[in-house]
DNA sequence: ACAAATAGCGTTTTT
DNA sequence: CGCTATTTGT
């Protein structure tokens, strides 16, 4: 083993080797993009184990995502296949490690919990809070923002909790919620760390005392995670942390300020640097250097490579069409689609690319954050299992019975009665849930479980999404059975563990079918691109107002710059930036100043925004296609609410009016059509062509009188009434009369 | 019951 | 800044 390890060490560059061999009790490694950070981290772990004879069980390796933790574990196992998995129990995300400590070593009873406590998602905590408000008749203002208000209330110190800003009972609620969670044996992600931190301060030394704390992507730590680290270090652990201050893009969700500085001072940590980037061509690196905050060195070792292409486009649609053609060409040249990626600033920007790529036959995959909670049927099923496995969880029982979409659709009051009384015979579904643990032995696979709950009946067979729903549920059950088998646990307790483990929230329950075909173009936000790399990267919409997004303060501005830095450093060989002359969203037309910050000699401008006569026709077809699609599956997609924004903005954009008069628009360059019709932009309703504005449509309403139609589509109608102003109506329900 | 006043977003997302 | 949801005032 030691010999094998010598070879590993030889493969490292001097900087990497120094980090691995460093002997100081605390060391932070300032690792540049693409400098082999993960390799150093893994080699360090192996070094500690094989050479320094530190047991894996004496190491705590902390990451922020399950994905990162899985990668580290699987790379260790690949090098050492006979390594028993339970030696790596201390390897995982901050939250899963806190969970492990709480379950195995820390006296959670001191906080009123049992060892079998449950992990709940934020939404369930919110439900609990609303329940408490009702039960205790608390006065809470701005209930719609309760989640945010509670978050800030929980962060306030005990001493300052006298009167709330709005003079309501928010602090009382926070206190009650804490009690209630302990009573119901439930912890949120926040509680996992908070409680672990509290107990680590008090508990006896021997219970948890790793010899090493090793942290990946340490720049993303928030205060809670910093405290967790500190608790372990003050128990005698040495520290080895790796991260990149130039890749801080999550400070808005609380990553602590200037971590490297803090760690260096707090623990007299030695700071080492990994300056050499192996990933990108030197042109790309040179451009990236313009966006570094501090003058940290960033050295490349590769050839200059091709210039960065900057494209001027009329709008996102034209860009999408260009990209489709460009990618086809690259594919013909032998670059696989999997090596290409399109980045944008906002989730809502993906839609137009999806539509065009679908039409053009480009295989693609959109990276969307989806958890079980985002799919209504799975959310319902999890609650079904939760109550079945723990009938004390009455909130889940009530939720399942009173759901409108699934189950028996019992009213909330009645459901509460049944669940609280706990008497059988009132509801078949309720009886089945209560009987699950008893009958568990006979239910050997997902199909039998499905049948046991009579889900054929309860998953709302008349709904359009029934097939999709039952497939999703079967898949979830399948994953659960696989988990139980893998853990070699007794069935009921294995299921309980699955349903309550944070691993559930991190697992790819929904992505099974996507990963089959790998050769796809990836579409994602720049945020989501962190940690990935592609041969060809296309960053789209590099306009001011998008990249950078209009931000209030300096800090936000700097974060935007780091974000762009992250985006361009994902590219290995080829990078293209595009900006729009007619951005439909909040962006300004023209190139972002970020493009101007790159030395011109690195750039190649492509300013031809040719008229492409058929483009308008194509665009019309794409929009038509989308309309028929969204009409068909309105209720199935959980992401629907997110996707409504681009839809709306599309209705308002000028193309809508072009679509209504195709003959007129076709021979015009789209850019001209806007500039040549100044009256149009002065109109109150730009979606109407001048002709339509002249022959105004009038409607009569029983209450508001006669009004002028200002906006109209298939479902909605907006009219302006004299003395009343504008009013929106749903056509199907309003009693409107055309005049 | 309606109108005026006020608060606080806006985007990015993991556990 | 401009919009929306909510609270507060009449």
Per-segment meaning from a language model:
Residues 33-41, 45, 105, 269-270, ...:
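Helicase P-loop NTPase motor core
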Residues 266, 306-307, 335-450, 460, ...:
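ATPase/helicase motor core of nucleic-acid motors
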Residues 1-110, 286-289:
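P-loop NTPase Walker
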Residues 1-35, 39-40, 58-60, 109-110, ...:
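Accessory N-terminal region flanking or inserted into the helicase ATPase core
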Residues 421-528, 549, 604-607:
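Accessory C-terminal helicase-associated subdomains
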Residues 2-4, 224-312:
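Conserved RecA-like helicase ATPase core segment
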Residues 543-634, 692-725:
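C-terminal accessory regions
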Residues 92-100, 214-217, 242, 346, ...:
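Conserved helicase core region in the C-terminal RecA-like lobe
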């Amino acid at each position: 083993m030691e010999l094998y390890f010598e070879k590993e060490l030889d493969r490292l560059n001097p900087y990497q080797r120094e980090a691995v061999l460093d002997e100081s009790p605390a060391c932070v490694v300032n690792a540049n993009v693409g400098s082999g950070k993960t390799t150093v981290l893994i080699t360090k772990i192996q070094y500690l184990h094989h050479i320094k004879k530190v047991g894996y069980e004496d190491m705590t390796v902390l990451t922020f995502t399950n994905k990162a933790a899985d990668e580290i574990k699987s790379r260790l196992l690949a090098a050492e296949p006979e390594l028993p998995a339970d030696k790596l129990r201390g390897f995982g995300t901050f939250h899963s490690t806190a969970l492990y400590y709480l379950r195995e070593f820390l006296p959670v009873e001191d906080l009123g919990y049992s060892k079998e406590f449950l992990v709940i998602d934020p939404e369930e905590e919110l439900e609990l809070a609303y329940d408490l408000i009702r039960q205790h008749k608390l006065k809470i203002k701005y209930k719609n923002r309760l989640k945010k208000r509670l978050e800030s209330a929980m962060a306030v110190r005990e001493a300052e909790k006298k009167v709330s800003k709005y003079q309501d009972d928010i602090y009382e609620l926070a206190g009650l919620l804490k009690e209630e969670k302990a009573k119901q044996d439930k912890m949120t992600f926040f509680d996992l760390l908070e409680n672990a931190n509290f107990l680590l301060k008090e508990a006896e030394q021997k219970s948890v005392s790793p010899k090493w704390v090793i942290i990946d992507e340490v720049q993303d730590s928030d205060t809670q995670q910093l405290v967790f680290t500190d608790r372990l270090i003050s128990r005698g652990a040495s520290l080895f942390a790796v991260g990149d201050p130039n890749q801080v893009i999550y400070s808005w969700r609380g990553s602590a300020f200037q971590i490297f500085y803090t760690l260096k001072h707090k623990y007299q940590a030695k700071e080492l640097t990994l300056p050499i980037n192996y990933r990108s061509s030197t042109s790309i690196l040179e451009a990236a250097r313009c966006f570094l905050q501090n003058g940290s060195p960033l050295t490349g070792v590769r050839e200059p490579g091709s210039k960065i292409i900057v494209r001027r486009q009329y709008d996102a649609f034209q860009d999408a069409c260009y990209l489709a053609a460009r990618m086809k060409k690259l594919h013909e040249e032998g670059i696989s689609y999997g090596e290409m990626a399109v980045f944008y600033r906002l989730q809502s920007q993906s839609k137009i690319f999806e539509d065009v790529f679908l039409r053009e036959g480009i295989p693609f995959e959109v990276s969307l954050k989806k958890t079980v909670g985002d799919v209504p049927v799975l959310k319902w099923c999890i609650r079904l299992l939760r109550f079945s496995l723990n009938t004390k969880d009455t909130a889940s029982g009530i939720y399942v019975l009173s759901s409108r979409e699934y189950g028996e659709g019992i009213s909330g009051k009645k459901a509460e009665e049944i669940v609280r009384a706990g008497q059988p015979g009132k509801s078949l579904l309720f009886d089945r849930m209560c009987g699950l643990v008893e009958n568990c032995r006979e239910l050997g696979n997902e199909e039998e479980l499905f049948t046991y709950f009579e889900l054929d009946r309860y998953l709302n067979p008349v709904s359009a999404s029934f097939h999709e729903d039952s497939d999703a549920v079967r898949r979830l059950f399948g994953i659960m059975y696989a988990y139980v088998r893998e853990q070699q646990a007794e069935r009921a307790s294995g299921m309980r563990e699955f349903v309550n483990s944070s691993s559930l929230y991190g697992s790819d329950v929904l992505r099974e079918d996507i990963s089959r075909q790998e050769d796809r173009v990836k579409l994602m936000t720049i945020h989501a691109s962190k940690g990935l790399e592609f041969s060809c990267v296309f960053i789209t919409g590099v306009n001011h107002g998008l990249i950078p997004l209009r931000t209030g303060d300096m800090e936000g501005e700097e974060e935007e710059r780091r974000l762009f830095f992250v985006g361009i450093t994902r590219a290995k060989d080829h990078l293209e930036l595009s900006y729009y002359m007619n951005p439909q969203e909040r962006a300004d037309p023209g190139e972002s100043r970020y493009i101007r910050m790159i030395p011109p000699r690195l750039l190649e401008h492509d300013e031809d925004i040719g008229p492409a006569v058929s483009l308008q026709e194509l665009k019309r077809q794409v929009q038509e296609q989308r309309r028929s699609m969204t009409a068909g599956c309105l209720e199935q997609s959980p992401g629907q609410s997110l996707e409504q924004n681009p839809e709306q903005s599309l209705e308002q954009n000028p193309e809508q009016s072009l679509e209504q008069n195709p003959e007129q628009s076709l021979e015009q360059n789209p850019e001209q059509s806007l500039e040549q019709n100044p009256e149009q932009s002065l109109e109150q309703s730009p979606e109407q062509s001048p002709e339509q504005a002249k022959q105004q449509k009038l409607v009569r309403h029983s209450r508001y009188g006669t009004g002028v139609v200002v906006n109209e589509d298939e479902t909605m109608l907006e009219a302006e009434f004299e003395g009343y102003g504008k009013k929106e109506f749903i056509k199907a329900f309003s009693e409107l009369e055309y005049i």
